[in-house]
Amino acid sequence: MIYCTVCSICVFTPWIASADCSNAPPQRIVVFPLYAEEIIYGLVEPERIIYVGHHYAESGIDDWPTMIKSQQVAGECWENSDEEEILSLNPDLLILDSYLQDNFEEDFPAFFHSTVPTLFLDSPKSIDDIIHLIILLGDIVQKPDAALSMVNEMISSMSSIREVANKIPTNEKKTVALFGEPSIFFDLVANVCNVNGLYCPDEQSLAVANPDIIVLLPYCMDGGFLLDIGKEYSKDCIVQLESESSLSRITAISSGAIYALNFHGSQYIADCAMRLLKIAYPTFFSD
């Protein structure tokens, strides 16, 4: 078992590789975390990725940036994945979430006893974490220039977003509630956009919060398995909220301020942050 652990992402552990592959970039990558998948697809040729952490769903092409790129790639959440199937694809790099490391031998015995280099990643919790993660993955796949370009573009976009967000008067700060399906990156995006971000898992907490804006993820999961995704799913969720009479007094619902929005822990954070900023403070973008 050859592996590298990246804890807190900002602290790098040197990449460990066997003598046979130390000078060659990985060509057959298995990547489970979606945030890492988004970065990797932005750095390497699509054919270098042979397995991802979700199945392909055509309805999600507009909601997950890498969905169409992974159309011809095998994939499933780690809970439903088949180690032997994955190993039969002859991977030369496995990328997993760090929370899987403690029980790695028990949950993935075949991976554990293989010689495939494995990288464990903590989910990024800040913009700096995302930057460091992009640089790290760029080094591992031997695309440092592409990683630096990706970082510079993201920093430029985030600077523009912060410039607008910092102009928001305190008394105009909006409350945005993420309802239903959670996202570990919601708070990060909310902070960037200068909104009061709240997570409301159910209708009762939503009624108590009475947010100005409600956002829903455009997909639903069950234990990591993608159940549904896309515009029709989002539309059904919004209609269901709007038709619930007990919630009609909520500011966001009475004003029709309900939106489907994805949140990213990758270079795509700039895209979702800009969209949330325009939703929350449209007057700052009027011509």
Where are these regions (language model features)?
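Extracytoplasmic ligand-binding site segments that recognize negatively charged/polar headgroups
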Residues: 59-60, 102-106, 121-136, 169-188
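Solvent-exposed, polar/charged alpha-helical surfaces in well-ordered, non-transmembrane soluble domains
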Residues: 37-41, 84-88, 109, 131-135, ...
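Structured C-terminal subdomain patch of bacterial secreted/periplasmic proteins
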Residues: 27-28, 81, 125-142, 148, ...
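Flexible, glycine-rich surface segments
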Residues: 180-224
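Short beta-strand->loop
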Residues: 51-54, 76, 95-99, 120-125, ...
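N-terminal hydrophobic or amphipathic helices and topogenic motifs
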Residues: 1-28, 34, 38-41, 90
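Basic- and aromatic-lined ligand-binding clefts that recognize polyanionic substrates
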Residues: 25-44, 144-199, 263-273, 287
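A short, structured surface patch at a secondary-structure boundary
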Residues: 28-89, 93-104, 194-198
